[in-house]
């Protein structure tokens, strides 16, 4: 099944487009929130509801770990049955080209996670030596 990778407002549109170029050759697609009907100004709960309303298989990418701490957002994420990865804080301090190359480098690990039953949230660290770790959702 074709996977759609959703990048929220806590990620750069350039990151979504760059990773999207790689994903396209695998038969997948990347979308930044600015390009979806819900729009760039949608709240986290609004975009979660939008993704759940489609028949697509989504993997969300965010730089905002608060999804797991905010009760309403956590409940909406679970209700929507979403799969997600959180980029560790170090991503925010890293140039876009390195963010993209690191996500692409780790893509086989990330794609393996998509086979797990939703909902789930994993943190992807910025270091090669660190493993991807599951976050409570």
Report residues per predicted region.
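Ser/Thr/Gly-rich flexible loops in soluble cytosolic domains mediating phosphotransfer, phosphorylation
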Residues: 80-114
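Short, surface-exposed basic-aromatic patches at helix termini and helix-loop junctions that form
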Residues: 21-24, 75-81
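A general structural motif
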Residues: 2, 57, 117-119
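Conserved beta-strand termini and adjacent loop/short-helix elements that scaffold enzyme active sites
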Residues: 33-35, 87, 124-125
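Charged phosphate-binding loop/patch that engages nucleotide di/tri-phosphates or the phosphate backbone
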Residues: 110-137
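Acidic, metal-binding active-site segment of PIN/NYN-like and related structure-specific nucleases
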Residues: 44, 51-74
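Active-site-proximal, substrate-binding regions of enzyme catalytic domains
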Residues: 1-45, 66-70, 92
């Amino acid at each position: 099944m074709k996977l759609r990778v959703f990048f929220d407002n806590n990620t750069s549109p350039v990151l979504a487009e760059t990773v999207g170029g790689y994903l396209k050759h695998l038969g997948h697609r990347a979308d930044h929130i600015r390009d979806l009907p819900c729009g760039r100004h949608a709240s986290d709960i609004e975009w979660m509801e939008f993704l759940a309303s489609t028949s697509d298989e989504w993997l969300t990418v965010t730089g905002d770990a608060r999804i797991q701490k905010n009760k309403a957002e956590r409940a909406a994420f679970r209700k929507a049955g979403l799969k997600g990865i959180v980029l560790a804080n170090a991503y925010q301090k890293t140039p876009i080209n390195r963010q993209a190359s690191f996500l692409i480098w780790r893509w086989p690990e990330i794609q393996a996670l998509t086979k797990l039953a939703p909902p789930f949230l994993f943190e992807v660290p910025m270091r090669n030596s660190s493993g991807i770790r599951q976050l409570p959702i």
